[in-house]
């Protein structure tokens, strides 16, 4: 599932850097960095990542996914 | 009134409105609890609706997901706009943006 998620995000946002950590086998941390997030509200950034995942897995399966999105600049300055 | 109209009214009537599992005094989920904690720290007034309270509104839990096209609860609304769920609320709180959205640009 971890590779699938990575691939789906990559397909949706081709220039994204995707970092996924599964800490305990249940909870997933995903960090997505992309210039496509420039000037986009956080909620829209999350939608850009979550919408393709939602259609693949359904909403319930993704309850345990903690998502962080960054523009390259925000990532550098975090 | 349909559930979508009931949600719209709650969002219109409350400048800050949170749809959550449980109540602010007794949250039933860690994510809902964290959003309430943030609002308490900002010391702002907010309205809340418990999506698990079927006696109050059995359609709310699914209705709110359709309203925002967002799959999870809690959900925070400010000035009628959907802000986000737990992760986004915490991030906006930490960057100071949430306070600006609620209190205005003059907030210090």
Give names to the regions the model predicted.
Chain B
Residues 1-8:
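Flexible, polar/low-complexity N-terminal or interdomain linker segments that lie immediately upstream
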Residues 78-108:
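Non-catalytic, surface beta->alpha helical segment in thiol-disulfide oxidoreductase systems
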Residues 19, 75-79:
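Acidic beta-strand-to-loop metal/phosphate-binding motif
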Residues 8-46:
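Local sequence-structure signature of Cys/Sec-based thiol-disulfide redox active-site neighborhoods
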Residues 27-28, 56, 85:
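Secondary-structure boundary/capping motif
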Residues 64-72:
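Thiol/disulfide oxidoreductase modules built on the thioredoxin-like
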Residues 43-60:
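Thiol-based oxidoreductase modules, predominantly thioredoxin-like and allied folds used
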């Amino acid at each position: 599932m971890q590779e699938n998620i990575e691939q789906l995000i990559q397909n949706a946002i081709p220039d994204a850097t995707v970092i996924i950590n599964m800490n305990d086998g249940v909870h997933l941390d995903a960090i997505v960095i992309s210039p496509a997030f420039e000037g986009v509200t956080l909620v829209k950034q999350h939608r850009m990542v979550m919408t393709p995942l939602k259609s693949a897995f359904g909403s319930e399966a993704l309850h345990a996914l903690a998502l962080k999105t960054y523009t390259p600049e925000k990532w550098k300055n975090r | 009134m349909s559930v979508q109209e009931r949600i719209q009214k709650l969002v219109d009537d409350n400048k800050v409105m949170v749809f959550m599992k449980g109540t602010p005094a007794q949250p039933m989920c860690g994510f809902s609890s964290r959003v309430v904690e943030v609002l308490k720290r900002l010391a702002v007034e907010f309205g809340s609706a418990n999506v698990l309270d079927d006696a109050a509104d059995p359609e709310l839990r699914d209705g709110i997901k359709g309203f925002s096209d967002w799959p999870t609860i809690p959900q925070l609304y400010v000035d009628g706009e959907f802000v986000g769920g737990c992760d986004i609320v915490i991030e906006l709180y930490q960057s100071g943006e949430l306070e600006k959205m609620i209190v205005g640009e003059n907030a210090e």
